[in-house]
Every structure is written in structure tokens, then in C-alpha cells.
Amino acid sequence: MKLSKAKLLIGDKSSESKIILLIGDYEAPKTEVVLDAIKKDGSSYCYFYTEGVYDGELSDTLTNLDADCTLQSINEVVSDNDNLEGILVVDSLSAFPDNNISRIRRLTTICRDKDLTLICTMHKGRITPIDTSLAVLFDAIYYL
């Protein structure tokens, strides 16, 4: 499934709007595709972590978390939002440049504890063996 045609809003669209927590660098390849898909899908609100300041069209609906994104800050956002439905990791290599599997395992634990869906994007041209070990930790993966 192509991400641009995918429904990124997780959960029942007829219920209250959902919050999606995005983790990643907005300058990473294809992140614009992800943001455009969210805009088309009509998601009214989501959090966004980036190493820079995003000032695109969706800046009024994206809350920029601190640049030093930690699992603790992710856990706080998850704990503070009852209508959070899932976490989307934009480009796992950019979001976790050290490919630290233990960090992603802890993120997976946060999602399981809160009954959240964990999905990510990966790039077809940059698949590495470490990516395949990470793949089993996600509920869904979109290859761009």
C-alpha cells in the first residue's frame, strides 16, 4: 500500500478526532509525503518531534516536542492524551539514527501498555539488516 493513499488516521473515523504522535526529522526523505497524507486525511491534531523547526502548512496542527526527544517525553505525551490512538515513526533510520533496538523495544512497551498502534515508514532504497530486526517490533510498516 502506498502511504500517500493510506489512511493514516488510526481508529474509527466516526468517533472524536484522534491524535497521532509522529517521531522523526521533518527533513528526512519522504516526510513531506507523510505530512501531506495526514493533511488529506483530515487529522485535526498530532504531535511532531523534529530536530529542526517545522514551518510548513501543518505547523498550526503539529506541536513541536523538544529537540532532544527522549522516551520519557514520549511517555509523558502518551500519558497526557487519552485519545491518542497510535505512534507513527517517520523514517526509522532518521528517527533512531543509532539504530538502537533497545530504544525501539521500550517504545514498543509504551505502546503495548497503552494499547496503541505502532507504525513506521522505511525507505525501499535504504533497507539494511538492522531494519529487518526492527521490523518485527512494529504493527505495520509503510515502505516508501
Annotate each PLM feature:
Residues 1-14:
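Pre-Walker A adenine-sensing motif
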Residues 11-15, 39-42, 79-83, 109-115, ...:
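Conserved catalytic network of the ASCE P-loop NTPase/AAA+ motor domain
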Residues 14-76:
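Conserved P-loop
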Residues 17, 51-55, 94-95, 124-128:
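Conserved nucleotide-binding/hydrolysis micro-motifs of P-loop NTPases
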Residues 33-37, 102-107, 130-133:
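A short acidic, amphipathic alpha-helical/loop segment
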Residues 80-100, 117-119:
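Conserved P-loop NTPase "ATPase switch" module shared by AAA+ and STAND
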Residues 100-127:
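Substrate-engagement module of ASCE P-loop NTPases
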Residues 122-144:
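Phosphate-binding/switch region of NTP-binding enzymes
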